Amino acid sequence: MRIIVIGRTGFIAPHIVDRLCERGHDVVDDEGGVADAVVCVHAFTQEDAEAAVRLFRGRTGKLVVLSSGDVYRAYGVLKGIETRELEPVPITEDSRLRTTLYPYRNDPKFADYEKILVERTVMNVSDLPACILRLPAVYGPGDRHHRFGNWVKQMVDGSPMIQIGAGMAGWRWTHGYVENVADAIVLAATDRRTGGRIYNIGEEVVPTTRERLEAFAQIFGWSGTVEVVPDDMALDFRQDMAVSTARFRRELGYADLISVEEAVSRTIAWERSALTG
């Protein structure tokens, strides 16, 4: 297949390109050409989505757009921008979306960010089949957020104790290892059944934050203790962000190629090298 990847820099996109090439697909930079599928990595605003529709309408068989779990009402509850009524978990593709738009309006860099409007824009075009992938918290080598860097640093430093807030300790948030997420994106781009579909992406099992920390500790070989301490509850951690990925796995036969244990091991190794590099 001939596939265009828009937004080829950054954390996830290089893995997408690598996997497409490994599978024998023709990955091209020509945004003015014709393609079997287009993967739009960096569509953050309604304007971004409208530009993609204008550019590729009539020139591709499918537009795959990366979205986020922050579209769900559960995220608004967590952030305190929706009413405090909790959403049931696991969150499915049919769960309620936020009613309050622009969740990062107070941040000038992301004031116009809104994946709900991105999704709405591309899914409402009758002659441009689209597939929406709602991504989890993505981790692994190259993660500019260093999601687990603080844990690894404390383990490297030989800290006897790692503290974690009481609210976060029992909170569940779906994550995904970057190479597995890239594999899922490639499958969605190359499988002809995904047009018009919305899928959650991420690991099948969602541990609590404490359980995740303990898994890191075991794989690292850290023998300290985890201490749960009071936190200021800036977020409403009563609301889990655990999503179901059953639809994607069932409809497309998807399974993670890299185990959680191996993903954590690779992440630890990268974080350790980042500390010394």
Task: Please state what every model-predicted region is.
Residues 2-25:
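N-terminal Rossmann NAD(P)H-binding glycine-rich loop of SDR-like oxidoreductase domains
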Residues 142, 170-179, 198-219, 258, ...:
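Substrate-binding strand-loop-helix patch
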Residues 154-176:
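A conserved pocket-lining segment of Rossmann-fold NAD(P)-dependent short-chain dehydrogenase/reductase
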Residues 184-234:
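Mid/C-terminal beta-alpha module of Rossmann-like enzyme folds, strongest
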